[in-house]
């Protein structure tokens, strides 16, 4: 881990781990925390590494954190609108400080998201490839990006609504 983090740091890449770290040995947890701290100020790219992560776990964990805040009297759910709650919930999920997912590439020929980034990928565009991950190369990435570039991002709106908004 140290060797890889040094290389990532040298290339101005920020490292983030998402998932249930409590399932790992304390030494590995410490290594994850140190890697994030060492690269925290890097702004070239962000590498997000999912460890013991599941979208359902992520949302349940966020709900649990909010329930604890309600119990402590820090949040009054009766005084909140649905939009307020949605923003508060968003602040508790993993990757809350990162932009939403734009493109999710699924390799291996499967047509499912497999419990991955359920909240964060709400308006993501999906690209499915028959290639297995080890075989997914630069040409395959270019094909995925080209497909993405030719799509109309609607974010829950109809094509007519998007076109009217841009007119």
Regions found by a protein language model. Give the residues of each.
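Flexible, compositionally biased loop and terminal segments
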Residues: 1-167
């Amino acid at each position: 881990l140290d060797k890889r983090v040094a290389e990532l740091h040298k290339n101005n890449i920020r490292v983030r781990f998402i998932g249930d770290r409590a399932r790992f040995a304390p030494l590995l947890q410490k290594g994850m925390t140190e890697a994030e701290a060492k690269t925290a100020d890097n702004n070239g790219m962000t590498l997000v590494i999912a460890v013991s992560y599941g979208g359902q776990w992520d949302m349940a964990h966020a709900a649990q954190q909010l329930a604890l805040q309600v119990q402590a009297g820090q949040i009054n759910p009766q005084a909140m609108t649905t939009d307020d709650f949605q923003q508060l919930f968003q602040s508790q999920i993993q990757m809350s400080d990162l932009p939403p997912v734009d493109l999710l590439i699924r390799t291996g020929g499967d047509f499912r998201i497999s419990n991955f980034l359920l909240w964060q990928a709400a308006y993501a565009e999906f690209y499915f490839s028959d290639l297995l991950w080890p075989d997914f190369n630069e040409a395959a990435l270019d094909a995925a990006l080209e497909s993405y570039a030719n799509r109309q991002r609607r974010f829950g709106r109809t094509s007519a609504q998007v076109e009217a908004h841009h007119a």
